[in-house]
Amino acid sequence: MFEAGGLFGFTGTTMASLMFFWSVYRQFVPYQIRDYLEKCFYKMFGLVSNSVHIKFTEYTEDKGLKKSQAYDLIRNYLSSKSTARAQRLKANESKNSKSLVLSLDNHEAVEDVFQGVKVVWSLSVWKSNDQADSSEKRYLTLSFHNRYREMITTTYLDHVLREGKEIGLKNRERKLYTNNSSQDYSAWREGRWSNVPFDHPATFETLAMDLEKKEGMKKDLIKFTKGKDYYRKVGKPWKRGYLLFGPPGTGKSTMISAMANFLEYDVYDLELTTVKDNSELKKLMLDTKGKSIVVIEDIDCSLDLTGQRKKKKEEDEDEEEEEKKKEAEKLLKRERGERESKVTLSGLLNAIDGLWSACSGEKIIVFTTNYLDKLDPALIRRGRMDNHIEMSYCRFEAFKVLAKNYLEIESHDLFGEIKRLVEETDMSPADVAENLMPKSDEDDADICLTRLVKSLEEEKEKAKKLAEEEKMKKAARDARRIKKKAEEEHKKKNKVEENGDVSHDNGNHI
């Protein structure tokens, strides 16, 4: 007679062996082989099984144009389940780096229980063998018994998406994105955009700018965030364009950071020179999320977007010099093996303001430039760049903001002298701030303000000399132009006289 103790002993030994072999299999067998074996197993098992599998891809379209929001929400939901149940986890720093956030690692599975029903989530990665596309495609698979199909596809999935959204809002960390180079396809394994936490401290309160202009900017941004229904009513995509222009050091980048902090938006820093062509630019724009600011800094330098309708320059020699410089830069790029971007002006306009721009809402687009007159009018027209904001040199109102930020003072005996100088002298807020910043523990407000006064006086004298030199150069150019015109008129007169003599001689001959 078979004894119960022997049965239990046999069963326990068998289960222990199976658990051991399963652990070895998961730990040491490469995931490529595991994927293949598991696919074969599921196919065989599917003939006699009632299991259902639902696949959630990272990108919604076959060609990966737009990232799936459902995929991100499910990843958020699974992050809380993975910590306690998964064997392999991926650790990332959380907001403010105070703790770690654990999430499901690639090629790992985790169980979940909902209303007594057990389901299994697995994260897989598929890599194309096509050399032209070496990117990795991620997808999540939900597996469950067929008898629970209705409950899982309605109640459970609604629960997952709702919980994932709440977790995402709770753990949301604003990010600064930059586009990966089209030439570096391996970077695309993490998507078209790479990101780091956005932690810039700039605010409108600390921005060195005219108070009235700042308040107008804040009101404009608030109006935009509340304008979803209004934009739909008037038939426009929910986006707004800002053009920030002014000399270097006047706070254009700081303004963008202040806007992002004010709205609590992510920032996408789009580097056009690394974008392969117009098609790639569209994909990048589609892969940006709502509640974000897309920035193209120094757009006059990013690509040759200024020459299509460029105004004729005053001096031909300056134009020739610039053409020589451009040719030298192109030659240098070819020698380095760098590929030139094929993004065109029309391609950029279509990406930011064409049919494709309506694919995601609540988005702000910002261009910055040091030279407004260099830009093509089509690029900055009203309706495309709705708000043109001049970031000018530091005047007294902006100086008072900087003095409060750097020295924590709102009045001083030198303020009167400084007011006179900043109104007469063109100095950028960045240069003013550098003079106000204490260089040692001994530097107090008196020392810093005295240093600023001296710097302003030197800058004023320098500007005066430059103006005199420019005046002399202009006089020399005018003299050359008058001389050249006189020589041309003289040549023309001589030619007319020569033609007259020839005609006279021909008449005598006849």
Swiss-Prot record:
SMART domains: AAA. Its cofactor is Mg(2+). One of its GO terms (cellular component) is membrane. This is AAA-ATPase At3g28540. InterPro entries: AAA+_ATPase, AAA_N_dom, ATPase_AAA_core, Mitochondrial_chaperone_BCS1, P-loop_NTPase. It is found in: Membrane. PANTHER family: BCS1 AAA-TYPE ATPASE. GO terms for biological process: response to stress. Keywords: ATP-binding, Hydrolase, Magnesium, Membrane, Nucleotide-binding, Transmembrane, Transmembrane helix. The keyword Transmembrane applies. One of its GO terms (molecular function) is ATP hydrolysis activity. Residues 460-510 are annotated as: Disordered. ATP binds at G246, P247, P248, G249, T250, G251, K252, S253. Its EC number is 3.6.1.-. The chain crosses the membrane at residues 7-25. The keyword Hydrolase applies. Pfam families: AAA, AAA_assoc. It is a single-pass membrane protein. Belongs to the AAA ATPase family. BCS1 subfamily. It is an enzyme of class 3 (hydrolase).
